[in-house]
Regions:
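N-terminal beta1-alpha1 ligand-phosphate binding loop
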Residues: 2-26
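Residues at alpha-helix caps and immediate loop-helix transition turns in enzyme cores, especially N-
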Residues: 18, 67, 100, 130-133
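Hydrophobic residues within alpha-helices
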Residues: 18-26, 104, 137, 141
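Short helix-loop-beta junction
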Residues: 20-32, 109-112
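Generic structural signal for residues in well-ordered beta-strands
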Residues: 34-36
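Glycine-rich phosphate/pyrophosphate-binding loop and the adjoining helix
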Residues: 43, 115-154
Length: 154
């Protein structure tokens, strides 16, 4: 069984709705379980112990939420321990910009995580299309975590 961590921040519930759709996708994959956690309650041990991770944030001033950036700052010391884990990003916001998503994807790259799929950007209230895309994102991430867990380690 692989565990996929879904770390998110949501003030209005929009990003949380996307996170719940990702959880639904993860749990639709046999052999995968999801752990949904607000980033302000997450620890670096949550990051270390998972097999894959999804990061979700609102778009604040064309960037991820400060509490998400704070989590990455705290996790810097364990970067080598999480390198290679499959990951994805998703964002919500009032604008049409994908800059918050790009900021999360830069962190994914900086931590040498594996980008398992392109992220999802939702504008305003998540649409059914956004929720379907997030469910698919969760499925893809869970399948990649399972594939990676089956690769023999040297």
């Amino acid at each position: 069984m692989v565990e996929v961590l879904v770390l998110y921040y949501s003030r209005t519930g929009r990003t949380e709705a996307l996170a719940n759709a990702i959880v639904e996708g993860i749990e639709s994959v046999e052999g995968a379980s999801a752990k949904l956690k607000r980033v302000d309650y997450a620890t670096v041990n949550d990051f270390i112990s998972c097999d894959a991770v999804a990061f979700g944030s609102p778009n604040y001033f064309s960037y991820m939420a400060g509490v998400m950036k704070d989590f990455f700052d705290k996790a810097l010391s364990i970067r080598e321990r999480v390198a290679g884990k499959p990951s994805v990003a998703f964002t919500s916001g009032g604008g049409s910009s994908n800059s918050a998503l790009l900021s999360l994807e830069r962190m994914i790259s900086s931590f040498r995580l594996e980008k398992a799929a392109d992220g999802v950007v939702s504008q305003r209230e998540p649409s059914e299309e956004n929720l379907r895309a997030c469910k698919k994102l969760g499925e893809t991430l869970a399948k990649r975590a399972l594939e990676r867990s089956e690769v023999p380690k040297d």
